[in-house]
Amino acid sequence: MVHLGSKPFRGKREQEAYDRTYAGRYQKLLRKNHFLYFGLPFILSIVAGSLYLQKFTAVKWEKYDERYRQVGEEEMLSMIENKRPVDKKNDYYRLQGLLHDHENEVSSNEDYEIVRVKRKKEDEPVW
């Protein structure tokens, strides 16, 4: 059996009749303009993919909006009212479990005054 390739053999009259049909005109147009064969299907697949994936992107942005929504005025006021004062030292000792010990030390040292010690004459900085 002889293999002639993918192009079917047509006689002269058959080819002219085929060229007048819609399929023949389309095939002739494809040979002249490669965009219809490569570019158009590519663009259509991109657009179809975008439309198909639109549901997933909508879900993504809804999750984003939930996470970063703006706080209403009433919620903001309730957050401010429930706020406790922040003290770095007390929070540090509280987290270490040493807050009770620290409060005892502070209460025992309340009568302590910080006094600057005078330097020797030779230790004084000279400008």
From Swiss-Prot:
Keywords: Membrane, Mitochondrion, Mitochondrion inner membrane, Transit peptide, Transmembrane, Transmembrane helix
Pfam families for the chain: COX16
GO cellular component terms attached to this protein's record: mitochondrial inner membrane
TM annotation in the entry: 34-53
Compartment annotation: Mitochondrion inner membrane
Membrane topology annotation: Single-pass membrane protein
GO biological process: mitochondrial cytochrome c oxidase assembly
InterPro entries to which the protein is assigned, alphabetical: Cyt_c_Oxase_assmbl_COX16
Family label: Belongs to the COX16 family.
Described purpose of this protein according to its UniProt entry: Required for the assembly of the mitochondrial respiratory chain complex IV (CIV), also known as cytochrome c oxidase. May participate in merging the COX1 and COX2 assembly lines.
PANTHER family on file: CYTOCHROME C OXIDASE ASSEMBLY PROTEIN COX16 HOMOLOG, MITOCHONDRIAL, MITOCHONDRIAL OUTER MEMBRANE PROTEIN 25
Name this protein carries in UniProt: Cytochrome c oxidase assembly protein COX16, mitochondrial
High-level lineage: Eukaryota, Fungi, Dikarya, Ascomycota, Saccharomycotina
